[in-house]
């Protein structure tokens, strides 16, 4: 309808919204327009973009006669523009998916979530909690997987057996299972997620 702009009031954006449709019906374009509108109004937007379709927000679009005639027919006063974006990635600059690395320190991740990631059973999870508790009591900050592996190896060694006794004991068999699970996670690339600095969700609300 010429002269009428279809827009969504900003106060309505705190409600749930579903964008659905068949392939090629404009779902990605709809998300892009929503993000553009929010960015233009000073609101930060977090988009999970697996295929990279939305990275075009960083570049101003190229004009063409066909585009201008279409927008004119729809009553739109179109002008190309770019928007500030920041690419987040699990891999970071040293991987095939460059971007600001999203990381978490082992200490912040915690033993319960890590036990789930490692598919540990209840006994193994409890042992991992004891290991975390000992490290915390010693003031040891577990940053990445090698840090955790070093602590487990120490506690199950001859030098660390006295320390191990103070936390109730962790069998070498259980420690071996945890160490093998850590190695498996690392071989699958999971080690890239752990490191410093840890990701702060407050950064998602940062405005330039």
Where is each model-derived feature located?
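P-loop NTPase motor domains
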Residues: 35-45, 52-208
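Short hydrophobic/aromatic beta-strand immediately N-terminal to the Walker A/P-loop
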Residues: 17-18, 46
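Gly-rich Lys/Arg/Thr-decorated short loops/hinges at beta-loop-alpha junctions or inter-strand turns
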Residues: 13-16, 109-110
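Beta-strand-rich binding-surface signature
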Residues: 5, 16, 84
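Pre-Walker A adenine-sensing motif
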Residues: 1-10, 205-208
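Hydrophobic positions on the alpha1 helix immediately C-terminal to the Walker A/P-loop
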Residues: 30, 34
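Conserved lysine of the Walker
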Residues: 27
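The conserved Walker
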Residues: 19-23
């Amino acid at each position: 309808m010429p002269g009428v702009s279809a827009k969504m009031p900003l106060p309505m954006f705190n409600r749930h919204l579903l964008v659905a449709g068949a392939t090629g019906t404009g779902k990605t374009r709809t998300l892009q327009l929503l993000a553009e509108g929010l960015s233009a109004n000073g609101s930060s937007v977090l988009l999970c973009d697996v295929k990279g379709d939305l990275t075009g927000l960083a570049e101003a679009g190229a004009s063409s006669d066909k585009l201008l005639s279409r927008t004119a027919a729809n009553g739109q006063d179109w002008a190309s523009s770019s928007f500030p974006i920041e690419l987040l990635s699990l891999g970071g600059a040293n991987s095939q998916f460059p971007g600001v690395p999203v990381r978490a320190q082992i200490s912040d991740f915690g033993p319960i979530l890590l036990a789930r990631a490692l598919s540990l059973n209840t006994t193994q999870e409890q042992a991992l909690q004891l290991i975390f508790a000992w490290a915390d009591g010693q003031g040891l900050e577990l940053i990445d997987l090698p840090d955790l592996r070093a602590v487990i190896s120490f506690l199950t060694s001859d030098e660390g057996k006295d320390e191990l006794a103070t936390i109730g004991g962790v069998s070498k068999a259980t420690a071996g299972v945890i160490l093998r699970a850590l190695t498996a996670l690392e071989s699958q690339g999971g080690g890239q997620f752990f490191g410093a600095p840890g990701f702060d969700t407050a950064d998602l609300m940062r405005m330039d």
